[in-house]
Regions:
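Active-site loop segments of alpha/beta catalytic cores
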Residues: 1-27, 90-329
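N-terminal accessory/capping or targeting/presequence segment of soluble
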Residues: 13-15, 20-57, 61
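Short aromatic-enriched loop/helix-cap "lid" or pocket-rim segments at secondary-structure transitions
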Residues: 33-36, 62-66, 71, 132-133, ...
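Glycine/serine-rich loop-strand microenvironments at binding/catalytic pocket rims
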Residues: 46-58, 63-67, 247, 253-267
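A contiguous, low-structure linker/loop signature
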Residues: 49-100, 112-120
Length: 329
């Protein structure tokens, strides 16, 4: 029988796994420093506001960042337009940050067992996210049309920064998975056209994918919402897994056409599971039905982004239990 680590890595690579792993409890995720403000003490100040390493102000939405999340402080903008970015943006000084101590300290705190558990490093605030965190969402969307040259320049600079983050992460942590984070879609469509994504973002993602693979690591990309139009592009540039594939995407279509080329992490009806009044058995039934439907259609791992400890606990228990029972052909 494979370990949790072996089963998860096999499923992410498209190899045979002995069972279906549960990601939240099945591996340890280390967060690369500098991209968020988590507060001096979330228990004492769960709704505190403070700066990340870029100077962007964040407000925590509760005491548990993994569930409660955080958001850019209401009304905050560092500046207004991308023709000003060189005057205002100061990239975090990676050479002077205690990256090794932070990453290793997180491993120690989380009691990582590298023999039994896969390790990922979450790198938040990708190119588009960082732009909208600096100048606001509306300004960021307009910038593709108003300041295309400046956006290209900023994204190229962001790419160099992220490449260095990857280099340092491999040097000091050597994780199995790099989990890049850049949201590109609403519930029903992408924030921008696929053509905009292909011009501005796809070349950056290709460089990141290549560097991650040079080190022998797996590239899992986080993007909430509807991104079905660019799944073939993600396959083309070498993304190994997309997380979370939400149900507004046509999961049946994605699994039929790309299920042997990219791992679909998700596929559960997050909104139904989190709805007030949804019972424990309904949550468990949703997990089982999607596992029955997709596990043998390709590279599939069930997953949700939880908004409550209750749903997370029920979901994780059902995936863990049923993942050992379901027949994998």
């Amino acid at each position: 029988m494979q370990t949790k680590k072996e089963a998860l890595l096999a499923r992410l690579r498209g190899e045979k796994a002995d069972f279906i792993p549960e990601i939240w409890t099945g591996h340890k995720q280390i967060v690369f420093p500098g991209e968020r403000y988590f507060g001096p003490n979330n228990q004492l100040d769960p709704y505190g506001t403070g700066p990340d390493a870029w100077g962007v102000m964040w407000t925590n939405m509760g005491p548990n960042p993994a569930v409660d999340g955080n958001t850019v402080a209401k009304g905050y903008k560092m500046f207004d337009n991308m023709d000003e970015w060189k005057e205002h943006v100061k990239f975090p000084p990676l050479d002077f940050m205690p990256i090794e101590q932070i990453l290793q300290g997180m491993c120690h705190m989380m009691q990582v067992d590298r023999e039994q558990e896969a390790v990922s490093c979450l790198m938040m605030s990708g190119t588009f996210e960082r732009m909208n965190q600096l100048i606001g969402f509306e300004n960021a969307l307009c910038a593709f049309y108003e300041y295309p040259d400046e956006v290209h320049e900023f994204f190229d600079a962001m790419c160099e920064y992220k490449l260095k983050c990857i280099d340092l992460t491999y040097k000091y942590l050597k994780p199995d998975i790099i989990h890049m984070h850049d949201d590109w879609g609403t519930n029903d469509n992408m924030f921008f056209s696929p053509e905009i994504w292909r011009e501005f973002i796809k070349p950056i993602e290709k460089r990141l994918a290549d560097r991650i693979h040079e080190y022998g690591m797996i590239y899992m990309h986080h993007s909430c919402g509807f991104i079905q139009q660019i799944i073939p592009d993600l396959v083309e540039i070498g993304v190994d897994a997309i997380n979370p594939m939400m149900v507004k995407n046509d999961i049946d279509y994605v699994m039929e056409h790309y299920g042997d080329k990219i791992t679909v992490v998700g596929g559960l009806d997050n909104q139904f599971m989190e709805r007030p009044g949804t019972t424990e058995e309904e949550i468990r039934a949703e997990v089982r039905s999607k596992m029955d439907k997709y596990v043998n259609k390709g590279r599939y791992i069930p997953f949700i982004i939880p908004n409550s400890e209750r749903v997370l606990g029920i979901y994780a228990d059902e995936v863990t239990r049923y993942g050992m029972e379901i027949e994998i052909k």
